[in-house]
Swiss-Prot record:
Disulfide bonds: none annotated. Its main location: membrane. This is Uncharacterized transmembrane protein DDB_G0286729. The keyword Transmembrane helix applies. Keywords: Membrane, Transmembrane, Transmembrane helix. It is a multi-pass membrane protein. The lineage of its organism: Eukaryota, Amoebozoa, Evosea, Eumycetozoa, Dictyostelia. The keyword Membrane applies. GO terms for cellular component: membrane. The chain crosses the membrane at residues 92-112, 122-142, 147-167. Residues 1-22 are annotated as: Disordered. It is found in: Membrane.
Amino acid sequence: MGVADNEYISVPTGEPVQQQPQTTSVVFGAPQSYYPHQQPQIILSAPTTTASTSTTDSTVVEENPVCCDRCDLENKVKYQRYSTVGPWLYQIIILFFSQQFLLFSIAPILGLFAMYTQNRCIVVMHFLTAAFYYIFSVIFLFSGDQINTILLSILFSIIFTLSLMNYSRYIKTLNKLANVGECLQSTINGSGFEVTIESQPTPTTIPQPIVQPQPIYVSQLPMMIPQPSSQPPQIIVPQIVYDANHNPIYHLIPIQNSNQH
């Protein structure tokens, strides 16, 4: 009978075919879809400092400036000149109770000039008149025989001493002010002065990425669990195929093992 071109004829052989043992292998591998040619990397952010290019000038107005020694002394003079008020008021009180008005009016007049001027000669003269008034008053009170007048004289002597100490500080400040040169700092405008400040470049922090490789541990790798093969082993046997001219052609064709259930 004839054989078609697309039909296969199995030829049994006398040699027994040994069944190949089934082997199972466990494969460990790392995913290469994300990092096919290099290790995985972690991108960290590290701050870097850059300088701003802004150099705009700004003007600041300060109150009660202290730009040099002269400014400091002038501020002290403004407050210490009130130390002349106490002696001047005491001289006015003595003037009202005195019988020689013209003589006792000289000291209060010097006190007015000492309060509104910074002339050291006038201030020193008024200080001497105030010291004379205080000493004269204490001596007059001590001359009494009563205890009240003696206690009053002690109290007045303490007050007069404190007043003269404050007055002497005012005179010392005027002497220091006279020996200090002129202020060559910023221009004074009223109670404050303008200071021109040239702004310096401001540092700005910009995060920069840092690439750091990440280590891979065995516990992080995917694992393929071996599964038992459910397919039976295949047997490869030679097969003869005839072409159109009826020439035999041998092929190796796998067939199922009929002995396995």
